[in-house]
């Protein structure tokens, strides 16, 4: 787990446990460090470093194009923030569900 994810562990836990409307409000006011931490989590899930259930994989497969943009290091943080605000609900809940056990250990 990266230092960025450790610094933002409390916010990641809050994003995982709150409703979609609350997630959207938190993401709109999020700092770039939190956006990058979320993208780090997504990168770890996409590349298989963090195991997730097959049910979560099928849900994330529907958002394949958005996931590619969020995990691309060439895309700016502002663009990633806009993508997360627009498509964030399902992506964040499913991806952070996979790393919840790691976050709870912090």
Identify the meaning behind each predicted range.
Residues 1-31, 35:
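N-terminal leader/propeptide segments of preproteins
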Residues 2-3, 59-60, 97:
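General helical secondary-structure elements
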Residues 5-8, 80-106:
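Short, cationic, amphipathic peptide segments
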Residues 11, 23, 38, 60-63, ...:
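Generic structural signal of hydrophobic/aromatic residues within well-ordered alpha-helices
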């Amino acid at each position: 787990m990266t230092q960025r994810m450790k610094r933002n562990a409390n916010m990641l836990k809050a994003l995982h446990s709150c409703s979609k409307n609350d997630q959207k409000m938190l993401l709109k006011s999020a700092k770039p460090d939190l956006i990058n931490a979320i993208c780090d989590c997504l990168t770890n899930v996409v590349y298989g470093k963090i195991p997730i259930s097959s049910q979560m994989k099928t849900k994330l497969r529907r958002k394949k194009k958005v996931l590619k943009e969020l995990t691309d290091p060439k895309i700016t943080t502002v663009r990633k923030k806009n993508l997360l605000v627009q498509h964030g609900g399902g992506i964040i809940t499913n991806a952070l569900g996979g790393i919840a056990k790691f976050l709870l250990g912090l």
